[in-house]
Regions:
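Amphipathic, interaction-prone secondary-structure segments
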Residues: 5-40
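Short, surface-exposed beta-strand-loop junctions and turns on beta-sheet-rich folds
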Residues: 44-47
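Intrinsically disordered, low-complexity regions of eukaryotic proteins
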Residues: 5, 42, 56-59
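Mixed-charge, Lys/Arg-enriched low-complexity segments
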Residues: 50-113
């Protein structure tokens, strides 16, 4: 697969970004050829105990489980939800009987730690 095809099959939209003295928080929605993934990313700031470890809290829906739900509908829902976004998104999916996977992952920057 060449670069042009990959770009056509991948989409990413920023939903929100928030920063305080502890960390920077990023909220994104990504579309892959076979799934849609909502990510809440937390990046602790320098001087914080978890500095150098990025946390990704993800909800993944395989395309075959979307039923009639579209990427654009999910994006609109997430952009209009301000607090407890992940929890409300999971409730939204459960009410529509949409199968999803939710997991917390992390990445360690060995150059920092």
């Amino acid at each position: 697969m060449n670069d042009t095809n990959l770009k056509k099959e991948f989409r990413e939209d920023a939903i929100d970004r928030f920063e305080n003295q502890i960390a920077t928080y990023y909220y994104t929605l990504q579309q892959y050829p076979d799934s849609i993934v909502y990510i809440e990313n937390i990046c602790p700031k320098k001087g914080m105990p978890q500095y150098g470890i990025d946390f990704n809290d993800e909800v993944e829906i395989e395309n075959q489980n979307l039923k009639s739900l579209t990427y654009e509908q999910i994006l609109l829902f997430l952009k209009n939800t301000k607090k407890e976004r992940k929890e409300k998104f999971i409730d939204f999916l459960k009410k529509r009987d949409i199968t999803f996977k939710s997991e917390l992952d992390y990445w360690i920057d060995k150059d920092v730690i």
